[in-house]
């Protein structure tokens, strides 16, 4: 019987370790740094109020949003889906430029963005403006996931 090449053994070990590590990683919130900055600029609520809100403002799907604010996040997710399927964008890892006047509903995505960056920026812009007009219900923050079936 032939001995296994040490380099192959090393690669096999690395793959096994990475698979074991990946299986223990809990689902992560979406990479939404620019969206967080838009919220921070236009709203006096803290970002943490919107993380883990309802069914759509977290990394889970649902049949029905729990309220208007959750509908804003549902629309953003649908916009991101369109960005991927129609435009080939990667909205969860994409950085873009935008301008904002602090605590105003004046957000501008027209900077020197590519078509994808501009599209994703406008997904976040629309969601941010929607959130500004939606009522925040603290009972929908950190809700039981069973409500999102």
From Swiss-Prot:
| Phylogenetic classification of the source organism | Eukaryota, Metazoa, Chordata, Craniata, Vertebrata
| Domain of life, source organism | Eukaryota
- Organism of origin is Micrurus tener tener
Share the domain note from the entry: The toxin-channel complex has a triskelion-like shape with one toxin heterodimer radiating from each ASIC1 subunit. Toxin subunits protrude from the edges of the channel trimer, with each heterodimer interacting almost exclusively with a single subunit.
Cite the InterPro entries for this sequence: PLipase_A2, PLipase_A2_Asp_AS, PLipase_A2_dom, PLipase_A2_dom_sf
Q: Give the chief site where it resides.
A: secreted
Q: Give one GO molecular function term.
A: ion channel regulator activity
- One GO biological process term: lipid catabolic process
Task: Relate the assembly described in the record.
Answer: Heterodimer of an alpha (Kunitz-type) and a beta (phospholipase A2 homolog) chains; non-covalently-linked.
The protein in question is named Basic phospholipase A2 homolog MitTx-beta
Answer yes or no on keyword Secreted: yes
Cross-referenced SMART domains: PA2c (SM00085)
């Amino acid at each position: 019987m032939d001995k296994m090449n040490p380099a192959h053994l090393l690669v096999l070990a690395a793959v096994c370790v990475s698979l074991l590590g990946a299986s223990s990683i809990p689902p992560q919130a979406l990479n939404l740094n620019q969206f967080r900055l838009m919220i921070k600029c236009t709203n006096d609520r803290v970002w943490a109020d919107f993380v883990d809100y309802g069914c759509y403002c977290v990394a889970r799907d649902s049949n029905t949003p729990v309220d208007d604010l959750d509908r804003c996040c549902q629309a953003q997710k649908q916009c991101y889906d369109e960005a991927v399927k129609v435009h080939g964008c990667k909205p969860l890892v994409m950085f873009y430029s935008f301008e904002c006047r602090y605590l105003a509903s004046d957000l501008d995505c027209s900077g020197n963005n590519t078509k994808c960056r501009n599209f994703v920026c406008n997904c976040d812009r629309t969601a941010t403006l929607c959130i500004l007009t939606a009522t925040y219900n603290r009972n929908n923050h950190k809700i039981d996931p069973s409500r999102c079936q």
